[in-house]
């Protein structure tokens, strides 16, 4: 199966209710290449493997091919990968993007809270993105959503022996058929109103025994808050 790291697709999901994920952003460099999450008016969290030195952040989007009047396009002023990010095993796959000017918060653009604690296995979460849906009927230009449970460390480690660090968690369905995939990378996993995950990697898309792997945001709270306070 393909090693899906470059970008990641919602498979087996549904079109999100428009603007129901107002923290969701699209990272654009002439085209949509990754997702991200607005965490306050100045900062976006994404995946380190989505790194580009300059990026346009598109907020308030639902259909990324159509101008709907709700959008804000703001360029980055700095892009900061986690200092311990490893492209070899995709460890610490998290980064911060500072906006060149504050986002205007409104119905369409709202931050998501950073986690107050790590969500336990079994917690239901929503992952969203504009990736490839692998479906002829779903419109990938419209934001896709999927509800997935956080899996236990043992289920995660059994799926990917020796590859799961304490900076990762698995979520989804071991039987396959529903997953995040190419084009969703860097995007949000939101559980009970908190950003618990960033779409990171996996084998293939929605394949049995290969759930999605996500950066574990709760262990990065100190780095996120101190970095945002510094810059």
Curated annotation (Swiss-Prot):
Record-marked site positions (Required for specificity): 179
Cofactor note: Binds 1 Ca(2+) ion per subunit.
Enzyme class (EC, first level): hydrolase
Name under which the protein is recorded: Trypsin-2
Binding site residues for Ca(2+): 61, 63, 66, 71
Signal peptide (from-to): 1-4
Organism: Salmo salar (Atlantic salmon)
Keyword terms of this UniProt record: Calcium, Digestion, Disulfide bond, Hydrolase, Metal-binding, Protease, Secreted, Serine protease, Signal, Zymogen
Gene Ontology annotations of biological process type: digestion; proteolysis
């Amino acid at each position: 199966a393909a090693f899906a790291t470059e970008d990641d697709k919602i498979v087996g999901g549904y079109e999100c209710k428009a603007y129901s994920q107002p923290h969701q952003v699209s990272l654009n460099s002439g085209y949509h290449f990754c997702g991200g999450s607005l965490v306050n008016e100045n900062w976006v969290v994404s995946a380190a493997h989505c790194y580009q030195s300059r990026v346009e952040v598109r907020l308030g989007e639902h259909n990324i091919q159509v101008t709907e009047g709700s959008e804000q396009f703001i360029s980055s002023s700095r892009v900061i990968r986690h200092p311990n990010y490893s492209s070899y095993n995709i460890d610490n796959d998290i980064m911060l993007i500072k906006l060149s000017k504050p986002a205007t918060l409104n119905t369409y653009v709202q931050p998501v809270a950073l986690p107050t604690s790590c969500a336990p296995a079994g917690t239901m979460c929503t992952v969203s993105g504009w990736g490839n849906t692998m479906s002829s009927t779903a419109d990938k230009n419209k934001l896709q959503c999927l509800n997935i449970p956080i899996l236990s460390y043992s289920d995660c480690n059994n799926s990917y022996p020796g590859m799961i660090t304490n900076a990762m968690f698995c979520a989804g369905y071991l039987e396959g058929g529903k997953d995040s995939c190419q084009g969703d990378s860097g995007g949000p996993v939101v559980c009970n109103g908190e950003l618990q995950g960033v779409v990171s990697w996996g084998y293939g898309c929605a394949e049995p025994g290969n759930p999605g792997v996500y950066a574990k945001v709760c262990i990065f709270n100190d780095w996120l808050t101190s970095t945002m306070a510094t810059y």
